[in-house]
Swiss-Prot record:
Cited InterPro entries: XK-related_adapter
Protein name in the entry: Testis-specific XK-related protein, Y-linked
Disulfide-bond pairs as recorded: none
Transmembrane stretches, start-end: 1-21, 45-65, 72-92
Expression by tissue: Testis specific.
Family listed: Belongs to the XK family.
Bilayer topology annotation: Multi-pass membrane protein
Keyword Transport assigned: no
GO cellular component: membrane
Domain of life per record: Eukaryota
Subcellular location: Membrane
Chief location of this protein within or outside the cell: membrane
Length: 159
């Protein structure tokens, strides 16, 4: 037996997806001096489906994962978690790279943990994105030595 939702339950998520897509397009246009971005109808539908899947996948994971978690599988999940957590740091220490020397305002460990935690929170579903070696943190040109305190506090607040 199927349970049909009301019209409001079907329309509000659709409006939310369309609004989020238009906000993203506006942000891209604003960042690129209001360059013209034209979407065909099929691309807009594709973006709506993609955005809906982006919204639904964490909800489904959070709902079904604890329900299927058995105590016998807990040690396997912890091993996988710690491997994913420690592998980028092991690669970083094995490569011999170092943090830039122009991070004097705040401690280097704070910068490294802040970058790692923020990057992990954004890209936690993509293991290849977490590698600190691929970020080339030893390149001093990537990091300006000005405004470190403001950027650090802003990043910490957003995390």
């Amino acid at each position: 037996m199927f349970i049909f939702n009301s019209i409001a339950d079907d329309i509000f998520p659709l409006i939310s997806c369309v609004g989020a897509i238009h906000c993203n397009i506006l942000a891209i246009r604003t960042g690129n001096d209001f360059a013209a971005i034209k979407l065909q109808v099929i691309k807009l539908i594709y973006l709506m489906i993609w955005h809906s899947l982006v919204i639904i996948s964490p909800v489904v994971t959070l709902a079904f994962f604890p329900a299927s978690l058995k105590q016998g599988s807990l040690h396997f999940l912890l091993i996988i978690y710690f491997v994913l957590l420690l592998t980028p740091w092991l690669e970083f220490s094995k490569s011999g790279t170092h943090l830039p020397s122009n991070t004097k305002i705040i401690p280097a460990w704070w910068v490294s943990m802040d970058a790692y935690l923020n990057h992990a929170s954004i890209c936690c579903h993509q293991f290849s994105c977490l590698s600190a070696v691929k970020l080339q943190l030893s390149n001093e040109e990537l990091i300006r030595d000005t405004r470190w305190d403001i950027q650090s506090y802003t990043t910490d607040f957003s995390f």
